[in-house]
Structures are given as C-alpha cells and as structure tokens.
C-alpha cells in the first residue's frame, strides 16, 4: 500500500486548527504536525490553503439492503457517503426483512464486507417478539454499534410498544440502546382528529400529527427507563425545544450515560418549508416550527446535544410524490451533511472546530470507536 505525505495543511483536530504535515502509512496515520521528513518516498499531497478534517462518522443511516434495493444499496449509499466526506456509518435495522436475528445481522456485515466503500457497523433491531435474539447481541460489543428500538412507528413497522418488554430490554442490554422516540398513542390521536376535520391532509400536517408532545413524552419515557436500569441510552434525532430540558451538559461526553443526537435537516428546515417542498421533507420525527430549530442550534453549541447525524433515508421520487398519507418519510442526506454544516460555518453559525467535534470526535467517543474520528 502506498504511503502519503500531506504537506503544509491546516489540521482541524481536538478544538484547534494547526498547520503542519500528516504522514499516512499503509492506510494508517503515523505522524501529525510540524514538518515531517521521511526516507520512504511517499506520495506527496499539497495541502496548502486547505483544511484537513477527520472522516465524518454518521451514526444513523438507512441504506435499504437487503430487500429494499430499488431505493438504494450498501454500495450506492456508501459511495454517496464517501463523496460527502462520511467515511464511517452505522446502519439501521428497518430493512426487509428487519434485522431481527443474528443471522440477518451477520448477512448485513457480509454484504458490507464485499461492497461498502466506507467503514461500517450495524444496529440490531428489536421487535415485540425477538428478545432472545436481541440479547445475543451482548456477546458482540466490539462489533455491533448498538441495539435500535423504535419506540414510535416509522418506516418498516418495527414499533416496540410492550412496556414489560421495553423494561426488560433496558434492564439487560449491555450495549448502547439507540431509540426513535415518538409516542404512538399521541400520533394516532392527532391523526384521527385531523382526518375528522380535514378532507385532504397535506405535508404541513405532519408537524401537527407528529407534534412536540409526542416526541417529549416518548423521550421522557426512554430516559426514565435508562435511569431505572443505568442503561447506556442514545436518543436519536431530537427535534423539539421541549425535549432539550431532558438533557444535560454538566459532565463531559465520555462520562454521560444518556446522549442525544440532532440531524442536519432539523437544523436546516422549518415547518415553513412544507409550503414549497411538501412531502420531499416529510420525515420522522417531523420538521417543526422555527423556534424548535433555533433551540436545537443553541443546544448543539452548548453541548446538550452531542452528535450531528443525517438519518439518511432514500426513497424513489415516486414514493415521495404521493399524497401525504402515502408519501414515504425520509430524506437522502449522507452526501450533503458536511457541505451543509460547512455552509453554516461560512455563515458564522458554528465554527469548523465545533463541526468536527460533533460529526467526528463526539461520535467516536459516544460509541467508543477506536482509531476513527480524530487525526
């Protein structure tokens, strides 16, 4: 394997930007900083007037393989990922069939080994009747990024709504539990009310149906369970101002037992955008009123929110163009997340160092990933 020497670049790492060289041997960073001289005749890369970032780690993607490959594959989406600077991903279990057994989990790893262009890990899926299979994942702490629980329904019908089972999983899981938190009873009630009063639902109704209260109540429930059992809990795609009161920033990330993720679309869009984009920005949890977006930004900058991710969820254009109730939920974002955050760096909303912290360092720390997320 070739050796590379990146010369005179701006290295963005651990809260600082420093100028220097970086030596890479056999795919591994060997030396960082200063002027590096080597006798191995490496391939030199001129890094002057450029910034060198760690590869982005996205802890929430849906790459659709197996079973939904008319939408995407591990190969196609990992290709999009690396094109956008995402060099590691963690993929969700709502494929077809869902990743409910160890055999199906291993199948994903086998596919990725052959086709992925990026580093990878996969979440084990939970349902209402696969507890024994889920617990077998405890033996794979160094391979599997975590256990995913849909505490609210979304693409794939993986809803876990048995309170006794939820308590049991939180009590006995030795891996990180990642949750999709939207209270199903509130969603159903809101939908029924709207159907009773409106002839045709539209995209903007999504934020009313999957409202702030649905998110808060379910996140609160997950945190109660985590406190009860001292579970390592990671709540995905926080989308509301109200949920932020559930999270703290007193202790460093590495000491937190409960962490929170925010997604780029909740930092970028608001409910006002439904008027133009319609179902194209339909996603779960919903994009909501603008004050939520501003609160999310504040919480990201003050470290109540720990990680920036995408929840990358591709569909065909036909699947997105249906009526509101038929249109699929999800946005394709993995190729665009870094570029979007760099846009906000240019706007002065966030520093480049903070982007690297939230998209690289913190993800590696949250999931205890070695040799990734830092330079």
Residue ranges and their predicted role:
Residues 132-308:
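Histidine/acidic residue-rich metal-binding segments in metalloenzymes
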Residues 86-88, 118, 145, 306:
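Short acidic/polar active-site loop segments enriched in Thr and Asp
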Residues 9, 22, 27, 49, ...:
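Divalent metal-coordination and catalytic microenvironments
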Residues 110-126:
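A glycine-rich helix N-cap at a beta->alpha junction
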Residues 1-39, 50:
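N-terminal metal-binding scaffold of metallo-dependent hydrolase/deaminase domains
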Residues 50-115:
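Metal-associated gating/positioning segment near the N- to mid-region
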Residues 90-91, 121-124, 232-237:
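Short catalytic-loop micro-motif centered on adjacent basic/acidic residues
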Residues 203-221, 225-230, 301-308, 313-375:
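His/Asp/Glu-enriched, well-ordered alpha-helical/loop segment
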């Amino acid at each position: 394997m070739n050796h590379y020497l990146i010369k005179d670049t701006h290295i963005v790492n651990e809260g600082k930007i420093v100028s220097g060289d970086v030596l890479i041997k056999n795919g591994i960073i060997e030396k960082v900083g200063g002027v590096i001289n080597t006798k191995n005749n490496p391939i030199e890369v001129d890094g002057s007037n450029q910034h060198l970032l760690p590869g982005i780690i996205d802890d929430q993607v849906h790459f659709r393989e197996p079973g939904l490959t008319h939408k995407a594959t591990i190969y196609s989406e990992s290709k999009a990922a690396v094109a956008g600077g995402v060099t590691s991903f963690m993929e969700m279990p709502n494929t077809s069939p869902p990743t409910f057994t160890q055999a199906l989990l291993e199948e994903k790893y086998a596919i990725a080994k052959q086709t992925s262009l990026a580093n990878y890990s996969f979440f084990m899926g939970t349902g209402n009747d696969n507890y024994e299979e889920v617990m077998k994942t405890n033996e794979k702490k160094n391979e599997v990024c975590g256990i995913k629980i849909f505490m609210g329904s979304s693409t794939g019908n993986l809803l876990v709504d048995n309170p006794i089972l939820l308590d049991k999983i939180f009590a006995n899981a030795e891996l990180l539990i990642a949750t999709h938190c939207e209270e199903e009873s509130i969603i159903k009630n809101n939908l029924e009310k709207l159907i009773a009063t409106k002839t045709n639902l539209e995209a903007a109704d999504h934020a009313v149906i999957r409202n702030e209260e649905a998110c808060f109540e379910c996140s609160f429930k997950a945190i109660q369970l985590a406190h009860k059992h001292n579970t390592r809990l990671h709540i995905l795609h926080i989308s509301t101002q109200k949920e932020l009161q559930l999270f703290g920033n007193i202790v460093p990330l590495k000491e937190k037992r409960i962490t929170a993720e925010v997604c780029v679309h909740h930092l970028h869009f608001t409910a006002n955008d439904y008027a133009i984009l319609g179902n194209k920005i339909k996603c779960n949890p919903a994009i909501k009123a603008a004050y939520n977006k501003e609160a999310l930004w504040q919480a990201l900058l003050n470290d109540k929110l720990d990680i920036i991710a995408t929840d990358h969820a591709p569909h065909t254009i036909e699947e997105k163009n249906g009526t509101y109730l038929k249109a699929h939920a999800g946005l394709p974002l993995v190729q665009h997340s870094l570029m979007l955050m760099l846009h906000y760096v240019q706007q002065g909303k966030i520093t480049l160092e903070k982007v690297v912290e939230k998209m690289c360092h913190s993800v590696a720390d949250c999931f205890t990933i070695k040799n990734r997320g830092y330079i």
